[in-house]
């Protein structure tokens, strides 16, 4: 089965055709002669465009190849660097914080410094008022940064280097306290007792094994019994 032929390829147009005709809307009346003229003009322009496109393809194919100035890697690297620096989406993310001198975008109804406490908005547009408010706020901020900040000692007359002397009541209380010996010192001595602090005042008890060498020492210590004369006197 052969494919159907393109409609209106050959003139004249079939009588009674009421479909689309190129350039017919630019004519005054849709007559049959005007329809034939419009279709003929459209065919000529289409053929002329095809010939120009064919000539361009031939010129490109026969043109001598240009010598590359840089390598392909250098060109791709330059394009990638340019994309990172000047891409619109990256610029929006990088420069989100705008300077104070720049007024807000039209329709922005957020906070505007110095707008309610000054007369910058009297008889001016919103953009001019916003620009003046931001400019005044920036000047106040810069002036506050350059101002001399007085230190705490200069404002309240307090010196941080000098230590405050203790009050006389504290000194009197310290004089009334007794001076106890320092037991944390290992070789310290008590001035009241006149001996080292760790010395036992009692005489050490010795077992009787040293006096009786014939009796084996069991490691136990026994008290000597009192004599009958001492017990009678007691």
From Swiss-Prot:
The keyword Acetylation does not apply. Its main location: cytoplasm. Expressed in testis (at protein level). Strongly expressed in peritubular cells and Leydig cells and weakly expressed in the cytoplasm of spermatocytes. GO terms for cellular component: cytoplasm; cytoskeleton; motile cilium; nucleus. It is found in: Cytoplasm, Cytoskeleton, Flagellum axoneme; Cytoplasm; Nucleus. It holds the Pfam family SPMIP5. Keywords: Cell projection, Cilium, Cytoplasm, Cytoskeleton, Flagellum, Nucleus. Microtubule inner protein component of sperm flagellar doublet microtubules. Microtubule inner protein (MIP) part of the dynein-decorated doublet microtubules (DMTs) in flagellum axoneme. May serve to reinforce and thus stabilize the microtubule structure in the sperm flagella. PANTHER family: CHROMOSOME 10 OPEN READING FRAME 82 (PTHR47301:SF1), HYPOTHETICAL PROTEIN LOC681006 (PTHR47301). This is Sperm-associated microtubule inner protein 5.
